[in-house]
């Protein structure tokens, strides 16, 4: 006997020629003679051994042996009425239903050799016929086999020592495991989509969302269309990407546990950019603009623009006694009085009398040795410092007036006289700021001045007039004035 028997060959050309009344050419799907409509590849078709029925034990049930010819007669009757095609061996086995002459729920393991995929391809090209054995009076059992995937895994895990021990023995044939339909479908589906499994209700559920379907093809299409891109699972806070949406949700909880908190108030957020914007808008809104030339801060762009005009002004006031220069006339006068008071008095005397003499203001400053004071002889002002008396004389008794009215051009040596003079222009349409020395002929200019200069100290303003208040309580107490009028 040949140690390596030759494998049976298959026939692919017109397999319907081999289906007749004496043989079965379609796969039975159970023990009741019902034939399945699925396409399967027949791995082997053999005639049962007739001795099995002759050598049966005497203790066996006689009714079983009597029913077997009836079962065979039913099969032959169906084959006479219809011709069934033998499926093509090109199609691989997707699901399998095993049956035998005895009803049993156990999984049957056969020791016959099954064709490998390479041999199937060779036999398909050779187009060799399928050997079909038939019998007139004996039922034919057809076994459909599926090569188990466990075989390849077991053979790969075998060590080299175990292979050497088996060289002297007969080479083992590939074990074929007969699987039911649901098991075979799951094995095939898990080869490409290992995460997608049918649940107990028979539905294929997506593990990334709530989608489910009873067809695996629908779930496969859903995975390609909906979950192909992983860029959508990106954290908006730290920009870290995740493979699934569930991992992203778990990661987002970390940011919720440790939010960004404002150190000036109770504001909280999980995004750092929002916290920065909140601090800039809420806590630093009073001084958002500053001058690059002198680093002076302003609360609005309009106020900064007015400040820029001071730097860009071409008119400069120069000190006639030194190299000091400024664009503010009041600043120049303050400089002259503080630094050059004596020279200012001499210049005033020359302007009035044309010469030094008894009218000289410098001669009006005396020193009281008893009380240790410098005294102004014109008005009696006294001070322990000579420079203070000189400044007093330069401001109060010279003809140079630092405060000049913009409307009429009249000058004043003191701020008090200057303010009194400005009040005289009220009937003529001069608007004065009641919080400082500012005055203007336009009401809109006064409103801009109040918003720019006094908004920080007096944030609460009345909508009916130009009054401003430091707190809301004073504003509320002021509002009844407008109701009575």
UniProtKB/Swiss-Prot annotation:
Disulfide bond annotation, renumbered to this chain: none
Compartments, as annotated in UniProt: Nucleus
UniProt region (Interaction with CTNNA2), positions on chain: 371-455
GO cellular component, as recorded: nucleoplasm; nucleus
InterPro entries: Snail/Krueppel_Znf, Znf_C2H2_sf, Znf_C2H2_type
Residues with the Phosphoserine modification: 60, 88
A GO molecular function held by the record: transcription cis-regulatory region binding
Biased composition (Basic residues): 1-14
Region (Disordered): 1-20
Keyword Cell inner membrane in annotation: no
Keywords associated with the record: DNA-binding, Isopeptide bond, Metal-binding, Nucleus, Phosphoprotein, Repeat, Repressor, Transcription, Transcription regulation, Ubl conjugation, Zinc, Zinc-finger
Entry-linked PROSITE patterns: ZINC_FINGER_C2H2_1, ZINC_FINGER_C2H2_2
Pfam families: zf-C2H2
Keyword Zinc-finger: yes
Function field: Binds DNA and may function as a transcriptional repressor.
PANTHER family recorded: CHORION TRANSCRIPTION FACTOR CF2-RELATED, ZINC FINGER PROTEIN
Subunit structure: Interacts with CTNNA2.
Name of the featured protein: Zinc finger protein 639
Naturally occurring in which organism (per UniProt): Homo sapiens
Protein's gene: ZNF639
């Amino acid at each position: 006997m040949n140690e390596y028997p030759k494998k049976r060959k298959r026939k692919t050309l017109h397999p319907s020629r081999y289906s007749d009344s004496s043989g079965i050419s379609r796969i039975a799907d159970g023990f009741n003679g019902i034939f399945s409509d699925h396409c399967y590849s027949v791995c082997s078709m053999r005639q049962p051994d007739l001795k099995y029925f002759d050598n049966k034990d005497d203790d066996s049930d006689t009714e079983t042996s009597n029913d077997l010819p009836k079962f065979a007669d039913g099969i032959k009757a169906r084959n006479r009425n219809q011709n069934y095609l033998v499926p093509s061996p090109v199609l691989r086995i997707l699901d399998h239903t095993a049956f035998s002459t005895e009803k049993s729920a156990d999984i049957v393991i056969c020791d016959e050799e099954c064709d490998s995929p390479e041999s199937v391809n060779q036999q398909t090209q050779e187009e060799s016929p399928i050997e079909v054995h038939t019998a007139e009076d004996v039922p034919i059992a057809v076994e459909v086999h599926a090569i188990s995937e466990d075989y390849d895994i077991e053979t790969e895990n075998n060590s080299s020592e175990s292979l050497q021990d088996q060289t002297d023995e007969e080479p083992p044939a590939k074990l074929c495991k007969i699987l039911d339909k649901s098991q075979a479908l799951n094995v095939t589906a898990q080869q490409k989509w290992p995460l997608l499994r049918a649940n107990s209700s028979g539905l294929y559920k997506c593990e990334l969302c709530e989608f489910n379907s009873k067809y695996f093809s629908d779930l496969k299409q859903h995975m390609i269309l909906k979950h192909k891109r992983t860029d959508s699972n990106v954290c908006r806070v730290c920009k870290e990407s995740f493979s699934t949406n569930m991992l992203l949700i778990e990661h987002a909880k970390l940011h919720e546990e440790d939010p960004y908190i404002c150190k000036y108030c109770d504001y909280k957020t999980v995004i750092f950019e929002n916290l920065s914007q909140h601090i800039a808008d809420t806590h630093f809104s009073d001084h958002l603009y500053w001058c690059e030339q002198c680093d002076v801060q302003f609360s609005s762009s309009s106020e900064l623009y007015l400040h820029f005009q001071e730097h860009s002004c071409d008119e400069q006031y120069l000190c006639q006694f030194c190299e000091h220069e400024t664009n503010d006339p009041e600043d120049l006068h303050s400089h002259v009085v503080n630094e050059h008071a004596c020279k200012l008095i001499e210049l005033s005397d020359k302007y009035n009398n044309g010469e030094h003499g008894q009218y000289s203001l410098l001669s009006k400053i005396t020193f009281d040795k008893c009380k240790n004071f410098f005294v102004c002889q014109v008005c009696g002002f006294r001070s322990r410092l000579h420079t203070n008396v000189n400044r007093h004389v330069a401001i109060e008794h010279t003809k140079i007036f630092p405060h000049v009215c913009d409307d009429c051009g009249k000058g004043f040596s003191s701020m008090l006289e200057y303010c009194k003079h400005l009040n005289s222009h009220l009937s003529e349409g001069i608007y004065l700021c009641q919080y400082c020395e500012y005055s203007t002929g336009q009401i809109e200019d006064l409103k801009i001045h109040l918003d720019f200069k006094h908004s920080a100290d007096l944030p609460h303003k009345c909508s009916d007039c130009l009054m401003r208040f430091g707190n809301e309580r004073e504003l509320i107490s002021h509002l009844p004035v407008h109701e009575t009028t």
